[in-house]
Every structure is written in structure tokens, then in C-alpha cells.
A protein has these predicted regions:
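A glycine- and Lys/Arg-enriched "phosphate-lid" helix/loop adjacent to the NTP-binding pocket
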Residues: 88-148
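Short amphipathic alpha-helices and their capping/turn segments at secondary-structure boundaries
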Residues: 60-79, 109-113
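P-loop (Walker A) phosphate-binding loop of NTP-binding proteins
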Residues: 8
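Hydrophobic anchor at the beta1->P-loop junction of P-loop NTPases
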Residues: 5
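Flexible phosphate-sensing "switch/lid" loops adjacent to ATP/NTP-binding sites
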Residues: 54-55, 68-93, 132
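Conserved lysine of the Walker
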Residues: 13
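Pre-Walker A (Motif I) flank of P-loop NTPase domains
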Residues: 1-2
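Conserved substrate/cofactor phosphate-moiety recognition/catalytic segment
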Residues: 18-60
């Protein structure tokens, strides 16, 4: 079984994935943000850094999915992830326009065909105030410039 947990930033995806892992005796595939060299600049100037940020996430998640999901599925093990590969296309539609969005969509479509889709997606929600409080509490440097 491949279970993915989705929702907006700060909603508790990683926390829930870690809580469920022992109960399902599953592997854990967590989204890695810290390695994106464009992310903190993106939060400061979305228009300028959107394409680089989105492309980095797209390729990074693709390689993570190809390795992590395939490894667990081939071994017959369950897997819990705190993101879906498809999610980044939603962010691209919000942050990109014109030729950049067209380029992103073409690459995403080609890569998406090669990824394994979750058997179940759990979507988490909470109030904006709760989200902003959680984001402030974890104090990640690249999230400090986020707008509500």
C-alpha cells in the first residue's frame, strides 16, 4: 500500500506520516525542502524565482519518487509519504505564467507518466491562524518571509 498525506504548508503532513509509520510498519518518504537553493529567494521575490524553484522541486521530487516508491513497492512493503508528486503542478499553476508554465507542464506530464500513484491520499486541513502559528514555531529560515 502506498499512502500519501497532502495539505498546505504547516498543516501536519509530516507529523501524521511519522505517527502512522509504526502502525502500518511502513517505509517513510518525506519531502525535502532544505536542499532547494531557490526557496528562500522565492519567498522574498516570487516572480523572479518561481520558475527555478518549481523546476528544482519537480526534478527533485521525481528522482525521490523513482527511488523511494519503487524500492518499497518492489520489496512488497507499504509506504507513507508526506506529499504527492502531482502537488507541485498545482503550485506551478499559481506561480508560473506563459512560456514558463507551458514548459513546466510539458516536463511534469512526461515525468508523471513514470511515477507510481498513491493507493490512498489523505488531505489535511486547518485554519489559517493555526498554519501561521505552526510555521512561526518551527522557524525555518526559508519560511520567514512567507506572506499569508
Amino acid at each position: 500500500m502506498y499512502l500519501a498525506i497532502e495539505g498546505v504548508i504547516g498543516v501536519g503532513k509530516t507529523t501524521l506520516a511519522r505517527m502512522l509509520q509504526p502502525a502500518f510498519e511502513a517505509g517513510l518518504l518525506l519531502e525535502v525542502f532544505e536542499e532547494n537553493p531557490f526557496l528562500s529567494n522565492f519567498y522574498g521575490d516570487r516572480a523572479r524565482y518561481a520558475f527555478q524553484t518549481q523546476m528544482f522541486f519537480l526534478l527533485s521530487r521525481y528522482y525521490q519518487q523513482r527511488r523511494g516508491v519503487k524500492e518499497h513497492m518492489d520489496a512488497g512493503r507499504s509506504l507513507i509519504s508526506d506529499y504527492t508528486f502531482e502537488k507541485h503542478a498545482l503550485f506551478a499553476r499559481v506561480n508560473l505564467t506563459g512560456d514558463e508554465l507551458e514548459m513546466y507542464n510539458r516536463i511534469h506530464e512526461a515525468l508523471c507518466e513514470k511515477t507510481v500513484h498513491p493507493d490512498l491520499i489523505v488531505y489535511l486541513r486547518t485554519d489559517a491562524e493555526v498554519l501561521m502559528h505552526r510555521i512561526a514555531m518551527r522557524d525555518r529560515p526559508y519560511e520567514r518571509q512567507m506572506e499569508r
